[in-house]
């Protein structure tokens, strides 16, 4: 049973995505999404029960696996190239090609020397991220069924591509599972790039000029982080002959000169988690349908960035990479919080709030202390729950009222009492005792 559950957890959303891509029957799609979401949540819980407190490592590295991963990288690069040429975004295409060719060059130059014994590592942090993606991500997928039906009735000018939408959502979740379980940085890089590509496709779903512009903003910023990731892999493999994240942490704690690798990976985490000055892509994602915003903010995209930085926390602290994380995270937390309280657009309030909380998470992880790292994990958990609920309720209110301006929500308790109750629960979860976000932020102050 050791490898079976993690393999099933990764394969289930991937197979579901492929079936949804070719299926054109709405009834089949609705049933498949609901059943897959239920099974995904059950498998996530099963993995948590089996491995929490008992880390499990798997070694699968082989020339064939390297070839498969390189083929996936190539397919992702070709997809990026296709869209960049189609919309004449040549600098973005250059970023994508640069990192792909860097990985290919590394494989041919140092790939045979740089090895990985344990390619997947299911530790407590991975389990927490699996539960967030599996349960919250599955619920968002189910919510999307009703939301997207109404969305296309109200936006008749937008081509109905729901099969493609759900394909990308489940591919996103599969990549997220692969990413958080990866210990081999080459494998993590592949899943990392798939999440960047999926976010690009979801943000640009409507095909409007604004959606296309914002999707490419997300793409080039995340490709910049992907290039840093590729450089980190090449440096680590070429100088230290390993590709394992766990080995990098061991070398860092032994005071070996791995800080360039750590700094590159932290920078990569900044781009994915929308730290300033890269927060623009997450704000631009609001043009996408509400389920996309909920998915990006709560259970997938931005959580991948903070996941990587939290994983690096043991070797951060009083060094350049740690100081960089604390400084960027702290500045992002402060300025995004100030921006959030000055907005009247409901989604903008939530977006800036997300960015500020991500900044606090990064700042905590940057200290390198055990207490602050676990505080960061607490914020990740409670933020995922509260923010997903708030995005979904605000999105539903927007559909019903035709506006997401907070002033238009006046009287919502009378017109939509059940929705209002869910919204209040989400709001309370963000700042009132005994809900988790208040406890997490109190713990953050104590940790500092």
Language model: regions and residue ranges:
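Hydrophobic transmembrane alpha-helices and their helix-loop junctions in integral membrane proteins
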Residues: 139-188, 198-448
């Amino acid at each position: 049973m050791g490898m079976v559950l993690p393999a099933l957890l990764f394969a289930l959303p991937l197979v579901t995505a492929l079936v949804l891509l070719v299926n054109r029957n709405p009834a089949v799609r609705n049933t498949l999404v609901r059943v897959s979401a239920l099974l995904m949540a059950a498998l996530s819980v099963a993995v948590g029960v089996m491995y929490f407190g008992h880390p499990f490592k798997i070694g699968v590295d082989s020339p064939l696996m390297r070839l498969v991963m390189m083929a996936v990288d190539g397919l992702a690069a070709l997809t990026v190239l296709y869209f960049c040429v189609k919309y004449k975004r040549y600098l973005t295409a250059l970023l994508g090609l640069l990192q792909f060719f860097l990985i290919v060059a590394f494989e041919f130059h140092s790939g045979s020397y740089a090895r990985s014994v344990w390619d997947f590592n299911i530790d407590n942090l991975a389990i927490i991220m699996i539960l967030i993606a599996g349960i919250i991500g599955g619920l968002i997928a189910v919510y999307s069924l009703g939301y997207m039906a109404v969305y296309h009735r109200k936006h008749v000018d937008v081509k109905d591509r729901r099969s493609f939408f759900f394909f990308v959502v489940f591919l996103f979740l599969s990549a997220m599972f692969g990413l958080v379980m990866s210990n081999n940085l080459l494998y993590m890089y592949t899943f990392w790039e798939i999440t960047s590509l999926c976010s690009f496709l979801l943000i640009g779903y409507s095909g409007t000029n604004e959606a296309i512009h914002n999707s490419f903003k997300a793409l080039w910023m995340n490709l910049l982080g992907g290039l840093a990731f590729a450089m980190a892999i090449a440096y680590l493999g070429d100088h230290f002959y390993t590709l394992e994240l766990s080995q990098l942490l061991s070398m860092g704690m032994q005071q070996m000169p791995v800080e360039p690798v750590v700094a590159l990976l932290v920078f990569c985490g900044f781009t994915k988690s929308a730290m300033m000055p890269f927060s623009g892509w997450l704000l631009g994602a609001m043009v996408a349908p509400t389920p996309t915003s909920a998915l990006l903010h709560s259970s997938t995209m931005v959580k991948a960035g903070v996941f990587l930085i939290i994983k690096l926390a043991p070797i951060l602290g009083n060094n350049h990479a740690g100081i960089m994380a604390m400084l960027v995270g702290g500045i992002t937390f402060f300025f995004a919080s100030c921006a959030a309280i000055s907005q009247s657009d409901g989604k903008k309030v939530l977006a800036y709030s997300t960015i500020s909380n991500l900044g606090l998470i990064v700042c905590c992880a940057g200290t390198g202390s055990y207490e602050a790292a676990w505080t960061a994990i607490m914020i990740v958990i409670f933020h995922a729950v509260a923010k997903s609920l708030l995005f979904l309720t605000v999105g539903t209110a927007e559909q019903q009222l035709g506006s997401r301006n907070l002033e238009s929500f006046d009287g919502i308790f009378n017109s939509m009492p059940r929705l209002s109750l869910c919204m209040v629960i989400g709001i309370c979860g963000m700042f009132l005792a005994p809900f988790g976000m208040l406890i997490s932020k109190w713990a953050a102050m104590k940790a500092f």
